[in-house]
C-alpha cells in the first residue's frame, strides 16, 4: 500500500489549440502518474460537464483555470492520503465531493484528470504497464482500428454531412499489419483526391476534408482508395460511418436536414437510406445514425439492420450506464462508444464497458476530436479486450500516439497478443 502525497493540475493545450487539464499524481514511494484530458467537438447533451472559465478575454472563453483550481485546492485535499491503488474509492470520493449528477460543480475535466493520473501512478507503483494494471493477466486483445480517413460534419469545414467515414482492416493478421493497411489506404486516398483536383487538407482527426457532392461520393472515393492500395473492400477492409445525426437533426420539424446534399429526411427515410448504403457498400458499423433523442427511430434502425451492422451509440448513450441500461432494455442499438470524458471517471468507464459486454453489446474505445499526446485509451482498449478502437487517421501526433502505444503493447504481449478481425463483431450474423 502506498499513499498519494501530491496531486497537481495545470492548464495545457489540446490538438485544436484549446486549453485542457493536465494532472500529476505522486505517491510516498516515489511513483508518478500524469494524464491529459480530451475534449469533444460534437457533444451529447447528456455528457458530463466540461468546466470552462467563460472569460472571453482569455482563450475565447475556453480557459480551464477554474477546473485546475478545483483540482489543486479542493480535490487534492480529498484525495491525498488515499491508497493509490484504491481506484474505486478515489473515484467515488470525487463523485461525492462534486455532488451533482453531471459533475458540473468541479468539472468532469478536473475529476477525470485525477482519476486517470491516479491509475497511471498505481501502475508505476506496481512496476507494470497501465494495460496490465487495469486488465490483469487477461488483457491481451489488440483492437481493430476504426480509422477516420475522410471527415465531414462538425469535424471539417466542407459540405459533407456525415461526420466520419472510416476504414476497418478486419482482414489483417495482427494490429501491426492493420495499422500498415490503414496508413497505405490513407496515402492512396490522398492520391485519389489529388487526381480529382480536390483539397487534401485534413480535419481535426487527421482525415481528409474535401468538398464532395454527396455522402455517397465519399464512400465511393474511399472504395477506390482501398482498391488502389491493393486491398479488397468487404474482405480485407470494411467501412464504418459516424453520422453524428444530432448535428443535422431539426428538433422543431423532427426531420434530418442534410444541407450538404440539400435533402431533408424523416427518421424512417434515414433508416431506408442506411439500408440502401449497407447493401451497396461493405459497411460494418454505423454510429449515431439517428438523433440522440430519436429512440423510436433508433428502435426501427435496430430492428431493420441490427443483425447485420454494428449500431453504435455515442451521443445516444454518452458512456453512461443509466442511459445504456435503458437502451439495452428497449433493444436500442447493439454497441456503445466509450469516451472517458463523457462520464468523467475511470471506474464509471469500466462499468459501462462491463455492462455492454454482459448484454451482448460491443464496446468501441474512442478518442475525442480535441486530443493530446496522452495514450491512456490504448491501454484501456487492451485491458478490457474491447476489440475496437476509434482514434482517428494514422496521421497527426495526437492520433498516432495511441497507435504507437498499441504497437508497443503488441510487442510486449508477444505471442500472447490476439487480433480478432471480423470476429470482433460477435453479435452480428456471420
Curated annotation (Swiss-Prot):
Mg(2+) binds at residues 242, 287, 314. It catalyses: (2R)-2-phosphoglycerate = phosphoenolpyruvate + H2O. Keywords: Cytoplasm, Glycolysis, Lyase, Magnesium, Metal-binding, Secreted, Virulence. It comes from the Bacteria. It is an enzyme of class 4 (lyase). PROSITE patterns: ENOLASE. Binds a second Mg(2+) ion via substrate during catalysis. GO terms for biological process: glycolytic process. One of its GO terms (cellular component) is cell surface. The keyword Metal-binding applies. The keyword Lyase applies. Its cofactor is Mg(2+). Pathway: Carbohydrate degradation; glycolysis; pyruvate from D-glyceraldehyde 3-phosphate: step 4/5. InterPro entries: Enolase, Enolase-like_C_sf, Enolase-like_N, Enolase_C, Enolase_CS, Enolase_N. It is found in: Cytoplasm; Secreted; Cell surface. Its EC number is 4.2.1.11. (2R)-2-phosphoglycerate binds at residues 163, 339, 368-369, 390. It holds the Pfam family Enolase_C. HAMAP family: Enolase. PANTHER family: ENOLASE. Catalyzes the reversible conversion of 2-phosphoglycerate (2-PG) into phosphoenolpyruvate (PEP). It is essential for the degradation of carbohydrates via glycolysis. Belongs to the enolase family. This is Enolase.
Amino acid at each position: 500500500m502506498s499513499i498519494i502525497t501530491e496531486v497537481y493540475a495545470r492548464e495545457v493545450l489540446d490538438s485544436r489549440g484549446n486549453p485542457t487539464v493536465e494532472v500529476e499524481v505522486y505517491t510516498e514511494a516515489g511513483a508518478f502518474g500524469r494524464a491529459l484530458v480530451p475534449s469533444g467537438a460534437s457533444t451529447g447533451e447528456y455528457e458530463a460537464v466540461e468546466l470552462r472559465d467563460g472569460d472571453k478575454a482569455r482563450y475565447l472563453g475556453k480557459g480551464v483555470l477554474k477546473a485546475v483550481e478545483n483540482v489543486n485546492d479542493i480535490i487534492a485535499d480529498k484525495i491525498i492520503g488515499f491508497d493509490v491503488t484504491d481506484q474505486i474509492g478515489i473515484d467515488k470520493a470525487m463523485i461525492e465531493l462534486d455532488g451533482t449528477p453531471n459533475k458540473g460543480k468541479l468539472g468532469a475535466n478536473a475529476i477525470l484528470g485525477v482519476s486517470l493520473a491516479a491509475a497511471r501512478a498505481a501502475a508505476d507503483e506496481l512496476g507494470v504497464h497501465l494495460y496490465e494494471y487495469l486488465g490483469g493477466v487477461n488483457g491481451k486483445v489488440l483492437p481493430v482500428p476504426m480509422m477516420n480517413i475522410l471527415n465531414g460534419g462538425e469535424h471539417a469545414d466542407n459540405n459533407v454531412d456525415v461526420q466520419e467515414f472510416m476504414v476497418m482492416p478486419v482482414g489483417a493478421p495482427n494490429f501491426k499489419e492493420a495499422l500498415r493497411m490503414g496508413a497505405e489506404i490513407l496515402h492512396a486516398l490522398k492520391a485519389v483526391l489529388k487526381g480529382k483536383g480536390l483539397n487534401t487538407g485534413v480535419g481535426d482527426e487527421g482525415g481528409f476534408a474535401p468538398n464532395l457532392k454527396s455522402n455517397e461520393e465519399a464512400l465511393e472515393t474511399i472504395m477506390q482508395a482501398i482498391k488502389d492500395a491493393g486491398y479488397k473492400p468487404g474482405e480485407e477492409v470494411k467501412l464504418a460511418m459516424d453520422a453524428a445525426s444530432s448535428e443535422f437533426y431539426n428538433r422543431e420539424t423532427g426531420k434530418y436536414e442534410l444541407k450538404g446534399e440539400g435533402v431533408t429526411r424523416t427518421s424512417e427515410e434515414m433508416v431506408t437510406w442506411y439500408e440502401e448504403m449497407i447493401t451497396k457498400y461493405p459497411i460494418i458499423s454505423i454510429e449515431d445514425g439517428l438523433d440522440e433523442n430519436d429512440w423510436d427511430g433508433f428502435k426501427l434502425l435496430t430492428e431493420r439492420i441490427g443483425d447485420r451492422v454494428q449500431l453504435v451509440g455515442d451521443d445516444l448513450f454518452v458512456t453512461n450506464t443509466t442511459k445504456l441500461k435503458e437502451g439495452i432494455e428497449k433493444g436500442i442499438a447493439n454497441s456503445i462508444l466509450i469516451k472517458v470524458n463523457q462520464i468523467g471517471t475511470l471506474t464509471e468507464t469500466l462499468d459501462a464497458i462491463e455492462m455492454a459486454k454482459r448484454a451482448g453489446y460491443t464496446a468501441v474505445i474512442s478518442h475525442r476530436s480535441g486530443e493530446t499526446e496522452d495514450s491512456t485509451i490504448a491501454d484501456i482498449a487492451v485491458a478490457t479486450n474491447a476489440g475496437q478502437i476509434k482514434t482517428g487517421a494514422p496521421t497527426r501526433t495526437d492520433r498516432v500516439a495511441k497507435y504507437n502505444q498499441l504497437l508497443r503493447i503488441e510487442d510486449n504481449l508477444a505471442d500472447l497478443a490476439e487480433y480478432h478481425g471480423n470476429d470482433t463483431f460477435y453479435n452480428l450474423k456471420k
